[in-house]
Each structure stands twice: as structure tokens, then as C-alpha cells.
């Protein structure tokens, strides 16, 4: 399915399913850190690949990117972007000891953040899968701590092979007390988009 | 004051002295800079993929693909008064941002981008005079069209000039 063939109705449906997915992910995160998490209304971005770094808050913003593939009955990419400060705050809640000096992440911290990504993506895909009556599973998460532009170009590779547009469903989340926040992005493959919309009963 | 022109993913831009060409956050993407030291004119591309996959090669030619970026820039540079024989090239980027165990369908994309750029330069007979590629970190480039010098900035690393 071509991204530019999508109607408002399609986009609204995508927002709605993503909202349900992220709500489950937020509950999981909230249980993990023992604090409430609030969600913003999801946004759907349909844009040229060239414009994507801007949507991530600028190519040079320093972020932790946790990347997973959506596998199973529909395929796509999931990217969880945590601003540096937010990732460090999250770590201070998850790991007992004080954060060491310097801003590179230790093996333990990387592992903890990947696990967070895994929990978020699993909760998201479980909810999405239940809604679609399909099986969706996340791949093993990988992590990169770098400039946003460098982190996301990897996600654009598959999309770039088949076209010049990227479709991203973005949901921002915030901790109620702590300065923990981030963005959850789902980038469905053009082919899988049809499967998702079809499964939730939206006319194509 | 020199003007700054920014180059996005899958784009290329041409500029003359004293303009600075910038591109931000190259991960597995590769930055290809061509410079004519006499005309003081250069081009910078930020390419995403090495080459189109089969069946997709009818796409409009753009700097999204490394294999086309050099050709497109050379054509444009010549239109702007550059001489092909004077052009020199510099490369940066082509990193591996995520651990290798995960790379399935796009395994080694950074490396393949660098190889594709080198091949495209060779086809055009443009000498590659400097490069800063590979490894596992993102890079931002600042290309001075007066001197041809490229400044490479990366997180937690000293600034490199080449």
C-alpha cells in the first residue's frame, strides 16, 4: 500500500491503535519505575525521508535510541527515543548505584535500557496484536547513544529502498513527577500497513 | 560572514566560496564531498543507501543512492564552472550504529555505502584524498568550500579536520 494513498480516516485509525498500544506500554513503564506516566495524543507523520531528522527534534540532538523490529503477521520498525537526560533519570530509578561520571553508558546501563525497550515494545505489540487478532512480536532490542540523525538513518534504510516517504506514528510520554519522557515511534512497512488497517476493519 | 547551507538525508548541495556546506548526524549514511580547489566550488551529498534494489532502478535519480550521488554532483559542478579533472573527493560516515547481531536485512549498510562511494569515484576518476569512515558513532560535517577542509564532529570525540 502506498503511503500517499492514505486518507484521514486511515490516519485516525492508526492513531487510535497506536494510542492503545502505547497506553499498555506506559502502564508497563509506570510499574517498572513506580511512577505514573502520561501520554500525549499520538501524531501521525507522513513526510519525506529528508525531513525525518527534524521530526525527531533535530539531527544533532543527543539521544538514546532503542530499536526493535516488529515481527510476525505484520512487519515494521519500532524506535524509542529518550533524550539523554531522560535516559539517565530512568537509569537512576532502575539501577541502585549512583551514575558514574562521564556521559558514556556502561554495559549495565545499556542492558537496563534495552530491557526497558523490550518491555515497552512487548506491551505495545501485545495490545496491537490483540486488537488485530494477529501475532506481533518484537525482535531483540539494540541501542545506540548518539546524535538523533545518526540513530535514525538506520530505521530509514528499508523505507528508502521502496520510496521517499516515511510514515511514523509518534506518541510522546512523560513521567508525572520525574523528568522522564520520550517518544515512541512505529514505522510500519508499506505492505504491513494494509495488514494493520485491514485487521482493524478500516476500509481500504 | 560565510553563508551556511545544510544538506539533508538523500540530498546534495553545490556551493561556492565562502559558503560552508553542513550535514548533521551521519550514521550509516555517507557524506561525499567533492571540491574544485581552483573554482573554489564544492558539493556535499548525504546518501542513505548504496544502490537501488532490483526492480526499483527506474526511480528518479537522487542522492539517496550513493551510486548516483557522485554522478549527479559532478554534472552539477561542471555546470557551475568546475573542471572534472581538478575535482578531489573526501568521504565520512558509514558507521555501524547498532550491534552486528541485529543486522539482518541491512547488514553492513555503512560499509556498503562507503564501498559504493569509492566505486562511483573511481568510475569518474576522482581521487579520494581523505576519509573518516566506519566505527560505531555518528558524525556531523562542515565543508569549507574555500579551503576544501572538512571538519568532522562526533559525540565524545575530538574534532577532526581533514
UniProtKB/Swiss-Prot annotation, chain B:
Keywords: Chemotaxis, Hydrolase. Its EC number is 3.5.1.44. SUPFAM superfamilies: CNF1/YfiH-like putative cysteine hydrolases. InterPro entries: CheD-like_sf (IPR038592), Chemorcpt_Glu_NH3ase_CheD (IPR005659), Cytotoxic_necrot_fac-like_cat (IPR011324). CDD domains: CheD. GO terms for molecular function: protein-glutamine glutaminase activity. Signal peptide: none annotated. It comes from the Bacteria. One of its GO terms (biological process) is chemotaxis. It catalyses: L-glutaminyl-[protein] + H2O = L-glutamyl-[protein] + NH4(+). The keyword Hydrolase applies. Probably deamidates glutamine residues to glutamate on methyl-accepting chemotaxis receptors (MCPs), playing an important role in chemotaxis. Belongs to the CheD family. This is Probable chemoreceptor glutamine deamidase CheD 3. It comes from Geobacter sulfurreducens (strain ATCC 51573 / DSM 12127 / PCA).
Amino acid at each position: 500500500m502506498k503511503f500517499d494513498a492514505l486518507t484521514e480516516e486511515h490516519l485516525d485509525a492508526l492513531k487510535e491503535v497506536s494510542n492503545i498500544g502505547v497506553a499498555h506500554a506506559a502502564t508497563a513503564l509506570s510499574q517498572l519505575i513506580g511512577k505514573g506516566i502520561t501520554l500525549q495524543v499520538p501524531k501521525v507523520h507522513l513526510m519525506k525521508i529528508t525531513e525525518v531528522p527534524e521530526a525527531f527534534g533535530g539531527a544533532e540532538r543527543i539521544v538514546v535510541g532503542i530499536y526493535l523490529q516488529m515481527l510476525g503477521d505484520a512487519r515494521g520498525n519500532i524506535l524509542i527515543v529518550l533524550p539523554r537526560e531522560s535516559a539517565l533519570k530512568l537509569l537512576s530509578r532502575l539501577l541502585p548505584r549512583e551514575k558514574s561520571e562521564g556521559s558514556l553508558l556502561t554495559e549495565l546501563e545499556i542492558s537496563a535500557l534495552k530491557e526497558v525497550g523490550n518491555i515497552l515494545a512487548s506491551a505495545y505489540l501485545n495490545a496491537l496484536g490483540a486488537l488485530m487478532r494477529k501475532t506481533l512480536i518484537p525482535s531483540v532490542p539494540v541501542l545506540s547513544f548518539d546524535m538523533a540523525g545518526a540513530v535514525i538513518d538506520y530505521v530509514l534504510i528499508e523505507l528508502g529502498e521502496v520510496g521517499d516517504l516515511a510514515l511514523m506514528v509518534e506518541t510522546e510520554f512523560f513521567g508525572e513527577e520525574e523528568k522522564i519522557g520520550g517518544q515512541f515511534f512505529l514505522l510500519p512497512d508499506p505492505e504491513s500497513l494494509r495488514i494493520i488497517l485491514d485487521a482493524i476493519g478500516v476500509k481500504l | 560572514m560565510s553563508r551556511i547551507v545544510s544538506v539533508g538525508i538523500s540530498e546534495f548541495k553545490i556551493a561556492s566560496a565562502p559558503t560552508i556546506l553542513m550535514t548533521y548526524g551521519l550514521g550509516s549514511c555517507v557524506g561525499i564531498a567533492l571540491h574544485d580547489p581552483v573554482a573554489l566550488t564544492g558539493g556535499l551529498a548525504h546518501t542513505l543507501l548504496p544502490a537501488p534494489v532490483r526492480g526499483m532502478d527506474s526511480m528518479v535519480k537522487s542522492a539517496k543512492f550513493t551510486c548516483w550521488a557522485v554522478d549527479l554532483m559532478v554534472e552539477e559542478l561542471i555546470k557551475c564552472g568546475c573542471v572534472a579533472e581538478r575535482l578531489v573527493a573526501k568521504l565520512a560516515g558509514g558507521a555501524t550504529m547498532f550491534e552486528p547481531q541485529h543486522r539482518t536485512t541491512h547488514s553492513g549498510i555503512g560499509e556498503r555505502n562507503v564501498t559504493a562511494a569509492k566505486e562511483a569515484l573511481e568510475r569518474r576518476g576522482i581521487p579520494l584524498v581523505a576519509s573518516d569512515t566506519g566505527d560505531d558513532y555518528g558524525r556531523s560535517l562542515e565543508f569549507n568550500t574555500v579551503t576544501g577542509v572538512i571538519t568532522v564532529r562526533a559525540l565524545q570525540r575530538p574534532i577532526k579536520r581533514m
